[in-house]
Amino acid sequence: MPPRKKETVMSEFERKRLENIAYNNAILSGISTTADKIIPKPAPPKPKRASTPRVKREPVKKEAARPTRQSSRLAGLEADSAVLKRKLDVEAEEEAAKAKAKRMRVSGDLNLGDITVEGRKWESSADGLALLKGLGVRGAQPGVRTFTEKDVKHTKDKGLKDLRLRMSGLKLYEKWAVNDIKIVPQRIYSMCFHPTEEKPIIFAGDKEGAMGVFDASQPTPKIEDDDEDAEYPDPIISAFKTHSRTISSFHFSPTDANAIYSASYDSSIRKLDLDKGISTEIFAPSSSSEDLPISAIDIPTTDPNMIIFSTLHGSLGRQDQRTKPSSAEIWGLTDHKIGGFSLHPRHPYLVATASLDRTLKIWDLRKITGKGDLRHPALLGEHESRLSVSHASWSSSGHIATSSYDDRIKIYSFPSAGEWKAGHDIPAKEMQPTVEIPHNNQTGRWVTILKPQWQRNPQDGWQKFAIGNMNRFVDVYAEDGEQLAQLGGDGITAVPAVAHFHPTKDWVAGGTASGKLCLWM
């Protein structure tokens, strides 16, 4: 039997030490409890469970000031749910309908008082038009000239030198700065002068169907010299939304100076009566859904009731104004777009077309053959360029000027065109250009295509045309290819791509991509 251990007697010191330890632990425990009350410990993560749809309270419906994008996630729609797909389909249909409605042409007569363009620049639209009533008749290098005073000075031919001096002497309009003459809201695609010689009145058409009118003869407002805070008022400019898409071309009636015709990519041709202030539809397809963008119009001087037009679908049409607007005879000439065309001013049965198929073609409206879709005017001759041809413009002397993307202005000469019989076959040799002028025609996406426009009835007898220059000028050339002037000036900050001559006076207008007007007189 093992011996019994002797019980250990706890000393006073050891007992006191254990009491102190117990007391200290009690204090620490109390502090921890107090801290938990002030800053609770993070709750332990709850076990995950299957998600259940939240019960959403019905929100108070508020009338939105304008359409806003809404989150499908916040709306409680799952990414692949049928409800979300339907919602997206409806939104897409609404946007497509809005876009289509914006581009849809407006049929019937339009009162200019109802279609004025809104904005500070055009607040006096009706007042501006009232001034017209009663009138009877490759990479660009901005600022770098390609025709200078030296070219004029070194001209040996006296007649040419005098003409160059006169044309180069045209001055940029000074009553208002170019930046203040915003004739239309968007990029200018077309321009023309009113035929009156009393004062320069310019019409411009923009990318979205607005037509602007500016009377350059209007007086400048008087500002007191001692009034330092006075603001210089803007010029009076009228602007009207006559079309729903780009206005591609203007033409005045040969017999009525109060009638101006406009053509548009919205597939319509309209006639504006300046005295009555009414815009009437002259041509439009029978179906409002048919798309037939019109690229240019011209009116025969021998028959002002007829309107000839070209389309971006490669067709040429003839509309008699005395018949209903959808009764035009239309001929398919090419599978490519026709960017521009013109009639011979003295022999308007001769048509010159410029096309994306790289050709200049001459047609004869006196001889139309074929049946159905194969019916078309007689093709007299054609010339093919290296790249697409943008425009073909007849002069009254029988010259055709074209611009093309091979960076050339070509001039063709047909002085005996009036002697051609119907269906005359032009020899290939005669279809060659007599002059080729190097010219940067690379406009890119944001500048309107450069197109030559002849002066219709020059008072001085010199045949000349104007065309925009990518270096922010307007070039003027004679029928033999000699450059006569390069018009510029201070304050021109964009390319005056759309250039146009007054029919008789030496007035030249240029329109920019920002809707600004440059005018030389």
UniProtKB/Swiss-Prot annotation:
Annotated Gene Ontology cellular component terms: chromatin; cytoplasm; nuclear periphery; nucleus
PROSITE patterns attached to this UniProt entry: WD_REPEATS_1 (PS00678), WD_REPEATS_2 (PS50082)
A Gene Ontology BP annotation from the UniProt entry: DNA damage response
Similarity comment text for this entry: Belongs to the WD repeat DDB2/WDR76 family.
Assigned keywords, A-Z: DNA damage, DNA-binding, Repeat, WD repeat
Composition bias type Basic and acidic residues, residue spans: 55-66
UniProt repeat feature WD, residue ranges: 183-224, 242-282, 333-373, 382-422, 490-521
A Pfam family assignment: WD40
Listed name of the protein: DNA damage-binding protein cmr1
Region: Disordered, residue numbers: 36-75
InterPro entries: WD40/YVTN_repeat-like_dom_sf, WD40_repeat_dom_sf, WD40_rpt, WD_repeat_DNA-damage-binding
GO molecular function, one term: DNA binding
Biological function: DNA-binding protein that binds to both single- and double-stranded DNA. Binds preferentially to UV-damaged DNA. May be involved in DNA-metabolic processes.
Domain of life of the native organism: Eukaryota
